[in-house]
């Protein structure tokens, strides 16, 4: 897959990829960098968190349909990360997806959304140790897409970048 080769060539080590069970359609992606002026970056430093681990599962018709993307660890609060590690981003839906998007671009958008949404590493006793589940993420994502299809997606003001 060309996407995998492109990521291997990145010079800034923004992300790194490992195949899950050598499956080209199932990736674990390590997000190594978020905005260094953000509270999330500060959380990462304080908790010795080197990266945010995500899972991307690609459909057979990728790049014409989006991958399913979810956070695996650490457990995050806010930042558009919902139950199960589901991610609330229109570009991850069939309606919002474009076959021109690259995994790198999606990951950069996700990193920006985490910061814009005031994402934080969960430090609440008990809750921070509970792992995200794929089943819960899929159900949450399906529900949020249904809600947004009914009520629309909020477009941030131009002043927000």
Swiss-Prot record:
Record Gene3D superfamilies: Ubiquitin Conjugating Enzyme (3.10.110.10)
One GO cellular component term noted in the UniProt record for this chain: nucleus
Residues of the UBC core domain: 1-154
InterPro entries associated with the record: UBQ-conjugat_E2_core (IPR000608), UBQ-conjugating_enzyme/RWD (IPR016135)
UniProt GO MF annotations: ATP binding; ubiquitin conjugating enzyme activity
Signal peptide coordinates: none
Main location: nucleus
EC number: 2.3.2.23
Keyword Glycosyltransferase belongs to the record: no
PROSITE patterns associated with the record: UBC_2
Catalytic activity: S-ubiquitinyl-[E1 ubiquitin-activating enzyme]-L-cysteine + [E2 ubiquitin-conjugating enzyme]-L-cysteine = [E1 ubiquitin-activating enzyme]-L-cysteine + S-ubiquitinyl-[E2 ubiquitin-conjugating enzyme]-L-cysteine
Enzyme class (EC, first level): transferase
Pathway note: Protein modification; protein ubiquitination
Domain of life (superkingdom): Eukaryota
Coiled-coil stretches noted in the UniProt entry, renumbered to this chain: none
Pfam families membership: UQ_con
Active site: 88 (glycyl thioester intermediate)
Compartment(s) where it occurs, according to its Swiss-Prot or TrEMBL record: Nucleus
GO biological process: protein ubiquitination
Key words, A-Z: ATP-binding, Nucleotide-binding, Nucleus, Transferase, Ubl conjugation pathway
Subunit (UniProt): Interacts with FBXW7.
Function: Probable E2 ubiquitin-protein ligase that catalyzes the covalent attachment of ubiquitin to target proteins. May facilitate the monoubiquitination and degradation of MTOR and CCNE1 through interaction with FBXW7.
Family assignment from sequence similarity: Belongs to the ubiquitin-conjugating enzyme family.
Protein name: Ubiquitin-conjugating enzyme E2Q-like protein 1
